[in-house]
A protein has these predicted regions:
Chain A
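Coil-to-alpha-helix initiation sites in intrinsically disordered, low-complexity, charged segments
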Residues: 52, 62, 66-74, 92, ...
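Transmembrane alpha-helical core residues of multi-pass small-molecule transporters
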Residues: 11, 19, 114-115, 142, ...
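Juxtamembrane/transmembrane-helix interface segments of polytopic membrane transporters
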Residues: 15, 19, 23-28, 154, ...
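Membrane-water interface segments at the C-terminal ends of transmembrane alpha-helices
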Residues: 22-33, 55, 76, 140-169, ...
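N-terminal Sec/SRP start-transfer signal
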Residues: 1-13
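An internal, D/E-rich "acidic patch" concept
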Residues: 60-120
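Alpha-helical transmembrane segments of integral membrane proteins
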Residues: 2-4, 97-134, 150, 175-317
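Hydrophobic alpha-helical transmembrane segments of membrane transport/permease proteins
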Residues: 15-72, 165-182
Length: 317, 340
């Protein structure tokens, strides 16, 4: 067990080192640096930047040293919490990123708070009797909601609830301070898209458990059906969904981009896109690094949790 | 035993077409002209106006064949019908009586009304361009770029998967580590990083989709290969002294096909969503040609009102129906493959 966790930790560290290298290397090209120089020094564009001014700027920023030194410098700064400076927003990247991540965390909290009970409930109800009309109906709903892309779900919800009925605000820009009503549509969009996957995985796991001999024994020895489900089936059926739930965090970091942009919610995804469209290199580097760190950590938690929950693996390895 | 001799009847056209060669031929007849039409219109020269004509009967024949092959699953037939509806729209768009999709006529015309001598079934957008025409022309770009990107991702992912699974050892170590690194990026983050680095365009979307999906495909193929390479027929081929490339292409590849086809249907859906979403975000295909993501982007900026909501709904429903088609097709195929 300890060995497995250590092995995983080493693997995760290796992936982080490699990923950070890739992220640093692809944005450390001459082209991006010239753009940055123009943004800082002012001027009419990359073509008008003289070689001399560019060389001076590089020297002033300490960027004229060899690549590996710059990389080491960047990693050192990042480890100390210094993520550089955003040119578009004209402020330090660290606090900016923290602020946006907090907003996305609020969104993610509500998404998980709704998605987990809904997905598990639908999955368990469908998987209890595989092939029954209830299973077919619930499975169809799960496939259907997952098949509609987030952008389309966002549009449908906005048109009906914001533009048509006028019950909810159409945007979540939160210009006049935090307003929980503005969160409803983004959260609903993400939940509708994501719960179907969890429900399908829970259903598959539940359906498999229900075919096991010990369930048949429990039924045959006359236990009430409720106790068979709650006491015997669920314990084993929920191991696989647990890993899925943790891994959904990785998906959520992708999913929030389009939802945050559509609803103009000031979260991590919108920050990343704005930085990408502007060419705000330090923001892209920092945001990507954080995204990878979150994804790798959730992978680790999911793996360790799985081993912990499933004794067959814990003692087998 | 009955002794009556049956007079040999000529098999019907459909029955004769039910073999892999004919199906591949039909797919090429449908797909090559469409790809050229969308990606390299200048290359076609004077053929430009007629090149898609033979693709229309090819599409219809393929649809009939597919329905016959998958008639055991209602879900698969519904999915097929949705996908083939858009395929048919894509190949026949130039010959349908549509208004030019880029021509501004009467801005903000609601659906089912006539304005300036034109009847608009689905209304017009804020620049007065016909939405019906834009929705139908838009599916061409989404389908062509989506399918091409997925195909490229599959070719590369499968190659690496076969190599990693068959040679094992340090080939496997290196390929698996590289794919683990790529898989640790959230997909949309990876797309944004790649498209920022390369710049937004159709070709770069192919690169981005390949980098993002090839690792996952490689994992599936690698797993299947590790299982299949212990079979007797693989040993037989190795003992005969066949070249590794022969073993991989002739012995292994045909046997990993089944699970991959289901995965490909799902992945076609993901890619279509990704292209639409990236275009909506401003990182994908560029204006002014019609495209669903672009239609959403333009409408979301300037028409956020109840009376103009049709501008958002048309592209949203179009893309949803296509994705639903791919997903139902994958579900039906899985159901059918489990039944055998």
């Amino acid at each position: 067990m300890t060995r497995l966790i250590l092995q995983r930790l080493v693997q995760m560290a290796l992936i982080m080192v490699f990923a950070s290298f890739v992220i640093f290397a692809i944005f450390d090209t001459d082209e991006f640096k010239r753009k940055l120089a123009v943004a800082e020094l002012g001027g009419f564009g990359v073509a008008a930047l003289s070689e001399e001014a560019y060389a001076n700027w590089l020297a002033q920023k300490g960027l004229d040293v060899p690549f590996h030194e710059r990389y080491a410098q960047w990693v050192g700064d990042v480890l100390q919490g210094d993520f550089g400076h955003s040119f578009e927003k004209n402020r330090a990247v660290g606090p900016l990123l923290a602020e946006r991540l907090w907003n996305t965390a609020i969104l993610a909290f509500w998404v998980f708070a709704l998605m987990i009970p809904l997905g598990l409930l639908v999955g368990i109800l469908a998987g209890m009797n595989e092939g029954s009309p209830r299973d077919r109906a619930l499975s169809f709903v799960a496939v259907f909601t997952t098949s509609i892309p987030e952008i389309a779900t966002a549009i449908l919800l906005t048109v009906v609830f914001a533009l048509g009925l006028g019950w909810l605000p159409a945007k979540a820009a939160m210009i006049q301070g935090f307003d929980p009503w503005q969160l409803v549509l983004p959260v609903l969009t993400l939940v509708l898209y994501a719960f179907g996957y969890l429900a399908r995985m829970t259903r598959a796991s539940m359906a498999e458990v229900m075919t096991q001999p010990y369930i048949r024994t429990a039924i045959l020895k006359g236990l009430p059906y409720r106790r068979v489900i709650l006491g015997h089936a669920l314990r084993n059926a929920l191991i696989a969904p647990f890993t899925i739930i943790v891994l959904q965090l990785n998906w959520l970091l992708s999913g929030v981009v389009v939802v945050e942009v559509f609803f103009e919610y000031n979260g991590f995804g919108r920050l990343l896109l704005e930085a990408a469209l502007f060419g705000d290199v330090y923001v892209i580097q920092a945001a990507t690094l954080v995204a990878v760190a979150v994804a790798v950590t959730s992978q680790l938690v999911s793996d360790i949790g799985y081993t912990f929950l499933n004794p067959r693996i814990r003692f087998g390895a | 035993m009955s002794t009556t001799l049956e007079r040999p009847t000529r098999p019907s056209l459909l029955a004769r077409l039910e073999n892999p060669k004919a199906v591949i031929g039909l797919v090429l007849l449908m797909w090559l002209p469409l790809t050229l039409y969308v990606m390299a219109p200048r290359l076609l020269g004077s053929l430009h106006d007629v090149v898609l004509l033979p693709a229309i009967p090819a599409t219809l024949l393929l649809y009939t064949l597919a329905v016959r092959a998958f008639r055991g699953s209602t879900v698969a037939v519904i999915g097929l019908s949705l996908v083939f509806f858009w395929l048919l729209m894509a190949v026949s768009a130039p010959y349908l009586p549509l208004i030019d999709p880029n021509r501004p006529i009467a801005p903000f015309t609601p659906p089912l009304t006539e304005a300036r001598d034109h009847f608009f079934w689905l209304g017009t957008d804020m620049r007065g361009r016909d939405l019906l025409s834009r929705a139908i022309w838009g599916c061409q770009r989404v389908l062509v770029w989506g399918v091409t990107a997925t195909t490229v991702a599959y070719v590369i992912g499968t190659t690496f998967g076969l190599v990693a699974g068959y040679f094992a050892g340090w080939w496997d170590e290196v390929i698996s580590f590289a794919s683990n690194v790529l898989l640790s990026f959230p997909v949309m983050v990876l797309f944004i990083v790649i498209l920022t680095y390369l710049g937004p365009s159709g070709l770069n979307i192919i690169v981005a989709v390949t980098v993002a999906s090839a690792p996952a495909i490689m994992r599936i193929v690698r797993g299947l290969t590790l299982d299949i390479k212990t079979r007797d027929y693989v040993f037989a081929a190795q003992t005969r002294g066949e070249h590794p490339i022969y073993v991989m292409l002739i012995e292994l590849l045909p046997n990993v096909r089944g699970p991959i086809i289901v995965d490909a249907c799902l992945r076609l859906g993901y890619t279509t969503v990704a292209i639409t979403t990236l275009t909506f975000l401003g990182l994908g295909l560029q204006p002014p040609d019609p495209d669903w993501g672009l239609m959403i982007r333009e409408a979301a900026r300037s028409a956020m009102l109840w009376q103009f909501s049709y501008m958002l709904l048309v592209p949203a429903l179009a893309v949803s129906s296509l994705i639903l088609g791919f997903n139902l097709m994958a579900d039906g195929l899985r159901e059918l493959s489990l039944r055998d």
